[in-house]
Amino acid sequence: MTKSQKIELVSKLEEGFKASEAVVVCNYKGLNTKKLEELRNNAREMDVKVQIIKNTLASIALKNAGKDGMELKDTNIYLWGEDQLNVSKVADKFSEANQTFEIKTAFIDGEVASVDKVKALAKMPSRNELLAMLLQVWNAPITNFTIGLNALKEKKEAE
């Protein structure tokens, strides 16, 4: 890779990291190409970017994006996106399914986050799931009232 290509890659990564709410760094050592493609497909469905980047280039891009402080060692794959829940869910789900894939560190909410925080975020319901739960709670009294009225109507008709 030439120096100009590296500079271009760093600037593209910097833009992506700046626009993202979360960056998760994982160890992918031992994963075959088929598994990596599976990860990329899962990430694409959730609007999460996935890329294997040299640590030095990633370090420069993260620092320029204001997201430095993560310890970057060994073989890393980077996941980032605008929705921190989606990024966390993709990383956690894939790490549970594949023993060799492990979450190492992350940058969430303007700070370096632990693996436990990433896993906790992954367990949280998404915005759409929360809205569905809220609507279900709001509709429950009306639904129960309607069921009661129908039961009363049927009872009156039976008499």
From Swiss-Prot:
One Gene Ontology cellular component annotation? large ribosomal subunit
Q: Name one GO biological process term.
A: translation
Q: Which UniProt keywords apply?
A: Ribonucleoprotein, Ribosomal protein, RNA-binding, rRNA-binding
- SUPFAM superfamilies linked to this entry: Ribosomal protein L10-like
Against InterPro entries, the record matches this protein to: Ribosomal_uL10 (IPR001790), Ribosomal_uL10-like_sf (IPR043141), Ribosomal_uL10_bac (IPR022973), Ribosomal_uL10_bac_type (IPR047865), Ribosomal_uL10_CS_bac (IPR002363)
Q: What is this protein called?
A: Large ribosomal subunit protein uL10
**Subunit:** Part of the ribosomal stalk of the 50S ribosomal subunit. The N-terminus interacts with L11 and the large rRNA to form the base of the stalk. The C-terminus forms an elongated spine to which L12 dimers bind in a sequential fashion forming a multimeric L10(L12)X complex.
Question: What is a single Pfam family found in this protein's UniProt entry?
Answer: Ribosomal_L10
Which family is annotated?
Answer: Belongs to the universal ribosomal protein uL10 family.
One annotated GO molecular function is: structural constituent of ribosome
Q: What is the lineage of its organism?
A: Bacteria, Pseudomonadati, Campylobacterota, Epsilonproteobacteria, Campylobacterales
CDD domains xref list: Ribosomal_L10 (cd05797)
Read off the PANTHER family from this record.
Answer: 39S RIBOSOMAL PROTEIN L10, MITOCHONDRIAL
